[in-house]
Amino acid sequence: PIAVAVTNSATHYVLSGYPEDLAAFGVEVAKEHKHQAKLREEKVRGGRVFDPVLEYLDVTLPFHSPLMADAVSQTVSWAEACDIDASHARELAAEVLLNHVDWAARVRALMNSTDPSTLWVLDFGPGTTVGKLFSTVAQGTGVGVVEASTVADRAELSTLETSPERTQNWTRFAPSIIHTSAGDKVRTAFTELTGKAPVLLAGMTPTTVEPEIVAAAANAGYWAELAGGGQVTAEVFDRHVAKLEEELEEGRTVEFNAMFMDRYLWNLQFGGQRIVPKKRASGTPIDGVVVSAGIPELDEAVELIHTLNADGFPYVSFKPGTVDQIRQVVRIAKAVAPTKVLIEVEGGSAGGHHSWEALDDLLLSTYAEVREQPNLVLVAGGGIGTPERGADYITGEWSKEYGRPLMPVDGVLIGTAVMTAKEAHTSPEVKQMLVNTPGIPAKDPNADPFAPLGEQWVPSGQAKGGVTSGLSHLHADIYELENASARCGRLLVRVMKHPEELESRREEIIEALNATAKPYFGDLKTMTYLEWAQRFADLAFPWVDETYADRFLHLLQRIEARVTKQESGEFESLFASRADVESDPNAAIAKLQAAYPQAAELKVTPMDEAWFPVLVREYPKPMPFVPVIDNDLLRWWGQDQLWQSEDSRYSADSVRIIPGPISVAGITTIDEPVADILGRFEQAMVKRVSADSLAADKAAFAELGAATSAEEFIRKSPNISWVGHLMANPAFGTANGDEHYEIRKVGTKGSVEQYDLDIHLDTYWDNDPDGGKSKHAVRDIVIPLNVDGAESGLFPVVDRDRLPEHVYRMLADTAG
């Protein structure tokens, strides 16, 4: 028989038994690993694959095993023969030879009996094994483990001038409560850095492409990410920024979520065209950039951080989804220290495109490495769909089920939960479907003992809890609600993998396409030219993009060229510009028919049929239909397929809806303000931390830097709002009482406190006998500021009423 001899830690065990049994065990482990790896490869479930490392210890006997029961008896017999206490001999022998040793439990019991951060453990040997085993279990508790197994070790200890280093103490990352005029707030490294609650509105297409929901979350004091995936042109971005600036309260800021691996978007937004930094330079209140969909190489990332900081973005975040990517971000943070870097670890239960990595696996594998880097601020997301689950991650209680110390994070990402918010453009029918979708539980018993711990999974190509995992046009896994659109997607994936079925299943494919918001255009060879134009208008109007009208114009001009009686040369078109077709395509078609009645009888030629896909691809914005059934069918259908879920013209059954499978279960309301949704997450954290916090509560003026006064808050604010424009704060980083940057309170108006930031300037004549007083010069620049401690996440705002007097005085000093 094989016995579990020793439990060294939550993940390290020692087995004892006959050599042949242990060898057979190794064979079975390899078989089970192969089976589990196949389940992962086939995307039946995600999480860490069962893959234990087996190593033989250099021993000749199976210690801590029932096989050694006779040896214990023999030891007792020898003890009796030598007149040694037999019961004591039995106890000692059994501990070495027979009994299971739960080393991890014994270490935890020791730490529970005292404050681990004050405990020192001396390892007198032999060797250093015991100290290493102790450190593994005690990781994150602050225990000090000191090697003292050799004379040299002990001699070194006797001459130490400072205390030896301790293991990491993760309790220092535990959240606490601060009492502010805005109410009780949770304090973490994230709130201290940003001044915003540890509940983040994640960037996600399509929900946070539009500015209304982003602005509403920011106005309530939350980190809110504008999704860069939907800012596809400079014109679209300009329009969204204009609306954002209109919706944002003065002193509020948002963040921009950029897709690094999408080279077109990255070049547009931060590469050659730099539309986002240019907007920031003009004062747009965007103060952070989240680099998602890939992690840059080290040198590129370091340069990027420095560039973004210089461009006015004090907050730069990376969004890794694998262990290797997390470690890459750790290296990046180390290279730019002490500059603060945010890391948004996202597990495979996040909505939309997803990995098969479990959030808990990612954190368990890398938490110690992340926490070793003091300038990293840790945010987690993916499957955090309820306020209670969010509180689990903020307090660190999520890790207890794995036998680990508390592993608190500094903030949590919320995405799926806001898809039905009042400010979300999600159509009413889709919102109702989201509420009706049961989703899957975060935790559920699994009959397979080798299944990974952590969250549950929706198998690829199957439906579970009303959610399925399909493939996007990028051939990447994507979560979506189970509906006609998802079923169509599965069929197209099947045909993509078996192209020989394309023709035989053509009618089935067309039927599936026509049940979605992106139907098949139709067989052009069966249509007349007039029917071609009418079908285009029926499927594309109202135009959601101006280039739809451009393509319709070009289609009508093509039809004119075909049906006109003129044989060659140029002719004067009925439709000279977009204005002729934009407002009423049906009127344009009627005009075409009146001028060319033959268009209602002539069939589309093969040449024009071949030209049609070229017209469809004329502009980057895909058309809302599939123009042709060919081997590129999945891309034709899958491109640009998310905006329809925000258009009431389309039924919820026909559109692609992409929530996370776990978080969708937490959606219970329709048209609840996003501030209230995020507020429920925040209040659950406040309640939990208030009950569990080890740290003493403290009073504070604001969350930013846990500032205790308005002056300290002003000096810790990286930006100020100047007449609606975000600009760098000249007093940022200065110490309280700095004589060059004097801050004076000048009044109060309700909850708003009024201050003057007086910047004292040097002049060329300061060393003159009279101190330069006889010379006309600007010796002070005064910036009047308003700060409101009753509002969370609000930066200092320049007082528009008091500003003119200071500007006029400066002009007078300049003019003399």
Each PLM stretch: what is its role?
Residues 13-14, 57-60, 95-99, 123, ...:
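Glycine- and other small-residue-rich loops at beta-strand/loop junctions that grip anionic moieties
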Residues 308-480:
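Glycine-rich phosphate/ribose-binding loops and adjacent secondary-structure elements
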